[in-house]
Structure formats: C-alpha cells, structure tokens
Amino acid sequence: MSGEIFYSVDNLYDLDSANCHPLVCHLCQEQYEHPCLLDCYHTFCASCLRGRVADSRLTCPVCGHQSVVKGINALPPEDRLLKFLVDSSADSEETVQCANCDLECKKQDVDAMYYCNTCCQPLCRDCRETTHKAKMFSRHEIVSLAKRTKEAHKKCALHEEFYIMFSTEKKSMLCINCFRDMQVESRAHCIDIETAYIQGCEKLDQAVLAVKELQMSAREAIILLKAMIGEVRANVDEEESAICTLFSNMQEKLAERKKILLKAARSQHEEKERTFKEQLSHLAALLPTLQVHLVTCSAFLSSANKFEFLDMGYQLMERLKKIVKLPHRLRPTQSSKINTEYRSEFARCLEPLLLLGQRRSMSTTGSVALALGNASGLMQSSLSVQCHSPAMSDMSLCSSVVRRPTSHRYISTKVLLAKGGETPFMEHCCNYENSYRTLQTEIQKLKDQVQEIHRDLTKHHSLTKPDSMSEILEKSVQVDSQISSEYASVELMRAMFEEIWEETLQRVANEQEIYEAQLHDLLQLKQENSYLTTISRQIGPYIRSIAKVKERLEPRLKEPKELKDDRTEIMLKLYEDSTSTADTQPSNELSCNTEDNWTLNSLSEETNPKNKDYYRTNKQKNTTDSTNRKEIPM
C-alpha cells in the first residue's frame, strides 16, 4: 500500500529515532488534525488514514498491525487525549480577538482579556465596561480569560451541573443530580474531586513506571538483538571457513557435499537474520509508541486540571495498562548459533575413509541471549534440587546432561527389547526395569501410608497407628539408600555404554533416550522420597502430641494385658462360687440370678470409664446384687 513508512536499516535500530514529537503525525509530519487511535496504539491524522481501509481492515503504516474498522470510509476512534493536548498547545500560541472591537491579544497576555460564558465570546477590558454595563447583562457570567475553563470538563453534560464527586466504580465524575440518581450501594464508591485527583495521580505514576520498565526492556532487547545479528554474521563466517577448510582436504570426493552444506549454512543464516530483523522491527516500532505515551502522560499532567484529568486520566491509565499487557516479543526466539553438522555429513560420505571422532555434545554452550534468558531458571532449578536431600547434590551434577525423557520411555524400551537380540544394553534394560518397578512400588506404598496418616490427622484428628510414622521414616531412608545405590550402579555403566553407542550409530538415539530417562526417573523417585521424608518429619510432632492426649484421656489403654487377664480370671472364679452355692435353689431362681449377674457384669464392663457417676451407680448395684446372692442360701 502506498504511504507506508519505510525506515532505513540503520535508522530502524537507532534508539534515538524513537524520540519524536508526540504531537506530530508520522505520515504527514504535521501537527495532528483529528487524531485517530489504531489498535496497535499508533496515532495518525484522520485525513492521512482515509482510503487505506481494505476488507474492513486498516493496516498500520508503522508496524503493519491490522485494525478492524466498520465500513469502507470508516475511521478508527478519535484519540481524545492527543486531541486535548493538541488543542492545549494551540490555545497557548493563537491570538484572541475581542468580539466587539476586534482588538487582538495573544493568549499569553490574558490579563487584559475577559470571557463571557453566557455569550461565549472574548471581550477586552474596555468593551467589558461599555457593552456589559447594562442591566440586561447583569446575569452574564464574565470571568478572566486566564481563569476560564472548559465547561465540558467542569459541568455534567446531562444535568448542566458542576461536578462534585467521583465514582471509583464507574471511573466517572458525578454532579449532585447524578449522585442522587445512583443506587445506595454505589454511593459507597464515591469520593470527592480532590481525593480522586490525588489517587488518580498515584495510579498514573504506577502505570508510567510500568511503561518505563517496558521501555528499558525493549531497549535492552534491541541492543541484544543487534549483538546477536553480529554474532550470526560472525558465526556464519566461522562456519563457512570450517566447511571450506574441510572441503579443501577432500575436494575430489566432497564437491557436491560442499554445495549442500554452504546452502544449509546460508539458509540458516537467512532464516535467523530474518527472524531477528522481524523481531527487531517489532520492537523498533514499539519504542515510538512508548515514547509518545510517556511524553503524553507528562504533557497531560502538566496541562490538564483536576476535572480534565478525571475526565480522561483513567482512559490514559487503561491505555497504558493495555500497552504493557500486549504480547511483546522481548526475548530472542532462536539462538545465533549456525550449526550444519558438517562433520557428520562429511563422515557419511566418507565413512570408509574417515575415523569417527567424538560426537558433538548434546548440550552445546548457549549464546549470550539464551544465557540471559535461562540463567535465572537454571539457578533456581539447581538450588531446588540440592536443598531437598544431601545425596541430591551428587546426582544433580549428572542431571545437567540428562535429557528430559519422553512420555513413551516405557513403550520405547519394550519396542527396543522386542527388536534386537541379546546385547549388553538389552540385559541392562531388563535388570533396570525390574529394579525400577520394585523401587516405584515401595515409593507408592510409602506415599499411600503418608496420605492415609495425613488424612486421619486432618479429618479425624486421631491416629490408629501412632508408631507408623517412625516406620515410614525408616523405610524412606532404606529406599533412599537403594535409589542411590541403583543410581550409582547405572551411572557406572555410562562408559561401557558410550563405547557401544559409538559402534552402533543407528540405535544410539533410542538407547540414550531410554538411559537418560532412567536416570531422570530415579531422580524423580529420589525427589518424591525426599518430599515424603520432609512431610513425614513435619507430621511427626503432631502424631506424638495426639498420642499423648489420647493416653491422658483414656488411662485404661496404658494398663498391661496381664492385668486384664487377671481380672477376667477373678470374675470367672466369682461366677463359679455363686453357681456352686446356688445349686440347692430351684432352677428358675438360679437361672434368674445367673442372668442378672451376667447382665450386671456385662454392663459394668461396657460402661464408659469417662462417666464417673454412671460407673459409681453400677458399682453400687453390683454390690447390692452380690449381697442378695449371698443371702439366698441362708
């Protein structure tokens, strides 16, 4: 489309190019006339945007973002903030002419001029005395031109009353009639104009700080991307030099391979540079927007009064928040490394002639950009792994080269075992699967036990097995030692497997993935066991306290079983004595007394020991019945 803004490559990345005038249109390079705001927060004159709509979309001439508009001749919404700033700047420069005598006076010299709000006309000092001296003009509101404010910002457009309150819920000013028409619940969110102005200034300061942080991040990202473009160029030169050096030694057999590798390097270079330039263009287009809005905020604060601020300040805050929340690509999406794997490509062509050296390490050293992006995450992950268990520090050293396993590790192991014959790695996998399943089962059992104890502790506030926590801790320590031993035994086999992997290039990828997954699974099991141990130690004091409370509330639980057995024997002897003395009585009386005795004995045993009164009553009944039984044979 004609009329786009094309920056040169050098100016596009220049940080000073963002310091443009906030009231000048990017297209016509003139002061804004009817400024329109696009969805990307770039602003242009309405006349500059006419004729650019295609399929109800308007493409931004600066960043290329498409804004949706309705109709062919439709335009984006008017930017009230910029229009206010443009009008404010124009008011300070234009001259004012008296409506009666045509006396011209600049607005800087406002002391000699007045303004009649009733007539909506400016008047000089002499005309004010001569024309408005009559009685019919006595009710006209005449104010100094310096103190005149726009009624649109000071009075309610619906009721023509002055604003007196501000609603923090609706973000709008209220006159006395608006306040009366509000619901009672909404009146609690109303504050006076002065308080609302102070709070609004504080919120705007916070929004400005967020935009400034985004501006600093964007500048740092531009510097980083410029450095990465230089790295890409340097790396592609280095890669091409290495390719050409190796090609010169094998010129006869690698002519075709040279063309392919150079093309691959160039393709990577073009792709990466194109990606970086696209991201750089996006950030370069973002800086003018940030600068314009920062200057806009400063100008708005300096030129707007309280009413104007409260009328449009929250729109500015909302816009700043939306700008900060837009998806800005501040980090490089790729590394600057150019890697064509030329050694492996040459080795494939000259495999009978070349001695295969050590393969390239899977974990290559990252560039400056990736180091800046991932340094904090790597430090946090390493610290979190080391703080769980002392033994984890040794295993975390090896975890740097451990790749994240795929979700199909177990399936890949089965497929690999089904494909090949008897190899050392196959034998290792068989042994490992058995050991791993055993350890996993032990960990799952411990997890179930801890979950059961935790559930009893939180829901029922009681424990069925107070000594189970110590058993879990002991078992956890044993499992931890088993995992460490298994991990060490698996780690010792790395050197042997690396030699085998060098010889079997076709199967090495699957085997390495499964092997590293095994180490990762062991690390995960060890981490779960560490979490389990920590939780068990935290629950231990609560279990001991509950056990002590239970012992205090139920003292009969502390009585040994031998006492209970002696009490049972005594009761049996008493029962036999009562039976022998009652042989002379009729059978019906004997059966009745026996049933009463059995009932009373059972009631005395089943009575809750906590109820002392009930226990004392039963005891008295038992003594009475025993005396009655003794008196029967008499």
Curated annotation (Swiss-Prot):
Residues 607-616 have a biased composition (Basic and acidic residues). Signal peptide: none annotated. Residues 577-606 have a biased composition (Polar residues). It is found in: Cytoplasm. Disruption phenotype: Morpholino knockdown of the protein results in abnormal contractility and looping in developing heart. Morphants show prolonged duration of cardiac action potentials, occasional 2:1 atrioventricular block and slowed conduction velocity. SMART domains: RING. One of its GO terms (biological process) is positive regulation of membrane repolarization during cardiac muscle cell action potential. Its main location: cytoplasm. One of its GO terms (cellular component) is perinuclear region of cytoplasm. The keyword Chloroplast does not apply. Transmembrane segments: none annotated. Keywords: Cytoplasm, Metal-binding, Zinc, Zinc-finger. A zinc finger (B box-type) spans 93-145. InterPro entries: RNF207, Znf_B-box, Znf_C3HC4_RING-type, Znf_RING, Znf_RING/FYVE/PHD, Znf_RING_CS. Zn(2+) binds at C98, C101, C127, H132. This is RING finger protein 207. The gene is rnf207b.
